[in-house]
Each structure stands twice: as C-alpha cells, then as structure tokens.
A protein has these predicted regions:
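Short, solvent-exposed aromatic-acidic interface loops
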Residues: 317-324
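Extended active-site neighborhood of metal-dependent phosphoesterases/phosphodiesterases
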Residues: 117-212, 234-249, 261-272, 276, ...
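Surface-exposed cleft-lining segments at the edges of enzyme active sites
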Residues: 78-79, 112, 181-192, 222-227
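N-terminal secretory signal peptides and thylakoid transit peptides that target proteins
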Residues: 16-43
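N-terminal active-site segment of His-dependent metallophosphoesterases
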Residues: 41, 50-122, 202
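Active-site neighborhood of phospho(di)ester-bond hydrolases with catalytic His/Asp-centered motifs
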Residues: 70-71, 106-110, 136-141, 216-217, ...
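N-terminal secretory signal peptides
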Residues: 1-24, 51
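Short acidic, glycine-rich surface-loop motifs adjacent to enzyme active sites
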Residues: 208-224
Length: 324
C-alpha cells in the first residue's frame, strides 16, 4: 500500500521511457514522477497542492483539511521484489505518525492484501490501526479473490452500496469511493458498471457546483497504458457527471508509481505502493512486481498526504518516500 502526493519533492526523479503507444511519450514525461514513501494531501478552497512534508506542511493553517492516502499494501507478498511487505507497511505507518500535522483521516485505494486471505486483512488492520486514524477503504483486485468477496465486504463494506461504493462529506468536501475491480474487462481494464454509474449521477446531482469533489478508486480513472489494463473503460461517463464542479480530484493506486495529469477542472493522481514498485508504462513485457537494488527499494515506496484549503481550487499533495 502506498501514500500518494501531487507534488514534486527534491528527492524525486523523472522516469523516462520511449514508447509512443497508449499515451504519448511527452504527456507521460510531463505528468509522471517516482516518489517515495507517501502523499500528504491538502485541500484548500477545493484545490490540491503539493507540499514538502516537513516544511510547507508545518505552515498549513487550522482551516485546512489534511488527509492521508495509502495504497497497494499487498500484505502477504513475499517475493524477491520485497520479501517483507508487512515490514515496509510498518515503516510507512511510522512515517505517518511522524507527520508534523496529524491527518483528519486516511483513504486506502486498494490491494490491502495480496491474496484476499483473512489473515492478511488481519495483519493489515493491525499495522494500519497504529496510525490511530479512521480509514476509508476501496478494494483492489487482490482484495476480491475469495468467493463472493466475503472477507473484504464483511470487514470494510458495511453500509456501502453494490460491490462497495459509497460517499461521505468532510469539511465541505464531498468524497466518493468507487469500485472498478469487480468486473475487469479485457486486458485487466477497470469497469464501474451501469449500477454504480447510475448511483454516482444521483449522488452528486443535488450538490452545488462549488463543492470540492474527491473521487478515489483502485484502478486509474484515466487511461495511462491500456495494454496493461491501466485505465477504466467507462471512466469517461463517470467524469461527465462531474464536469460542472469547479474542483475535482481523482486519487488512484494500482500502478505503484506517482503519475499526475490535469485536465480542465480535474486533477488525476496515482500513488505509490508500500510493497513494491512496478515498471514505467511500456517498459517491459508486462506489469508486475519489479526487483530493484535493495538500497533503492524504499525510495520507490511511500505515503501521500493531501490538504484542502478554503478558496483554493486544487488540493496540495505531498509524496514522502520511505527513504530519501
């Protein structure tokens, strides 16, 4: 699992690749960065911003809403890319507890477990609870491997709709947790489905256009690399219901690296994993755990902190690596 941030920190480097298919090389280079341990999100006036986790974060006022994004913890993973995913999750929570500003709550954008085992969910809960934060979850495909998705739904899905979608409000911001791993399409593309789209349209239709919106789901709601299933086939319809809002932020995981894109009033951001990195889009035959030198692993894992401030359009997002 990882924490996500929208900003570029001093310890981040650009990841380059030369493939022209899927997304244009220039566009990916413009929006893609490797980050470290986490993302600190600040929403101020509806706008996400990128902050240095120990510097600018300390300057945030009490009028800001700050929350944490975790993603892709893959508890139970023990392959060469990271033989101790539980240990790096623990390191991430230590980072969270050392933040200069305590987040109001956390969101987890899926793949809590690696194999949907009850014991893996138990271990994840034990570690994440050490943050002493309320956590709002959405599932990844690795959380839905057991018959009827019972272990995830019994633990995290109470009070949700359908396969686990829901919404809530905090400090004037409307948060929407969506599920796009229930019925994966060809190549592993995410899918929201007609029932969830109908629910979304109804969920937001009575909101003022000035309401800041934060959507979070596991698979990106923008097409990053369709050959690897890094996108959601019906995301465009979902986003059409959000066009009238002045500030929309979409937070995802799944690809285990930080990428960001801004389209009009919508900011898209993907978070790091706390378990293992994956290749840059098109760099290799397929996605999956990527083995890197041991001294580099923790620079590719991390957390994200997000802050919202009144009268600002975009959220401030801070990515912090487990190791600088």
């Amino acid at each position: 699992m990882g924490l996500a941030s929208t900003g570029l920190l001093g310890d981040e480097t650009m990841t380059k690749f030369d493939r022209d298919d899927g997304v244009s090389r220039r566009k990916v280079l413009e929006c893609m960065t490797w980050a470290g341990t986490g993302v600190l999100w600040t929403i101020s006036g509806g706008v996400p911003h990128s902050l240095g986790i120990m510097g600018e974060a300390q300057a945030q006022t009490s009028k800001s809403l700050t929350f944490l994004q975790l993603s892709d913890s893959h508890v139970g993973f023990d392959k060469p890319a990271n033989p101790n995913a539980l240990g790096t999750l623990e390191e991430a929570i230590v980072k969270v507890n050392a933040l200069p500003i305590k987040p109001a709550f956390a969101i987890h954008t899926g793949d809590i477990s690696h194999l949907s085992l009850e014991s893996q969910f138990d271990d994840a809960d034990r570690i994440i609870s050490q943050s002493r934060l309320d956590v709002h979850y959405v599932p990844g495909e690795h959380d839905f491997l057991d018959p009827d998705q019972k272990f995830y739904k019994d633990r995290y899905g109470r009070g949700t709709k359908g396969a686990g979608w829901y919404s809530f409000d905090a400090s004037g911001v409307h948060f929407i947790g969506m599920v796009n791993v229930f019925n994966l399409k060809a190549g592993g593309l995410g899918d929201l489905g007609a029932d969830q789209l109908e629910w979304l349209e109804d969920d937001v239709k009575h909101l003022s256009a000035s309401t800041p919106i934060v959507v979070f789901a596991h698979i990106p709601l923008w097409t990053i690399y369709p050959d690897w299933g890094w996108g959601t086939d019906d995301a465009e319809q979902a986003l059409s219901y959000l066009k009238r809002f002045g500030s929309v932020t979409v937070l995802n995981g799944h690809i285990h690296q930080v990428m960001q894109k801004v389209e009009g009033n919508v900011t898209f951001h993907t978070a790091r994993s706390t378990a293992f990195p994956q290749p840059a889009p098109g760099q290799g035959p397929s996605p999956g755990p990527m083995k890197v030198p041991d001294d580099q692993l923790r620079t590719m894992l991390g957390i994200a902190n997000v802050t919202f401030k009144q009268n600002e359009q975009r959220l401030a997002i801070i990515d912090t690596p487990l190791k600088a």
